[in-house]
Amino acid sequence: MTEIFHDSSISSNDVKILGLINNNRVEKYIDKKYVLPHENLMKYKVIIPKSNGSGSIGEVLSTPVIGLPVIGHTQSFISIGAYDSEYEANATLKYVKTKFARCMLGTLKVTQDNNPPTWANVPSQDFTSNSDIDWSKSISEIDKQLYEKYGLSEEEIAFIEEKIKPME
């Protein structure tokens, strides 16, 4: 029987797929003809595990990564964005690492399940260089910009800073 997935690319038509085998993150390759079309397959995106932590507010996300064009993933992951530029994907990665975004995620994420509906309270952003947020800054500096943008009180900021673990 012919193998569908391979440990290394064997053709220019191959797509890299991020998945899990025995709870370990793996990369395999598959011919593009076996992959259903998706809006972000040929775009930059951020890939995050669909299952993460226990649901406690403030948890760090388990190793989010930038997905380059021609990288897909199994249903063990979710992806955010479909960008033409790596800059936008990097800005998105910084955003999901902010305390602000993860606090908003924590308002709906009460289990380890990190499915798309749990992100509903995380405000969408402009991740281009024209954004009102300077994405070239550090994550903590981006948090400060987000606190100001959304008019958070000193009490709200103190709560986030105390309860949400930092990510770099």
Where are these regions (language model features)?
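Polybasic, glycine- and aromatic-enriched phosphate-binding surface used to engage nucleic acids
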Residues: 1-135, 139-141, 148, 162-168
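Short acidic, low-complexity intrinsically disordered linear motifs used
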Residues: 145-157
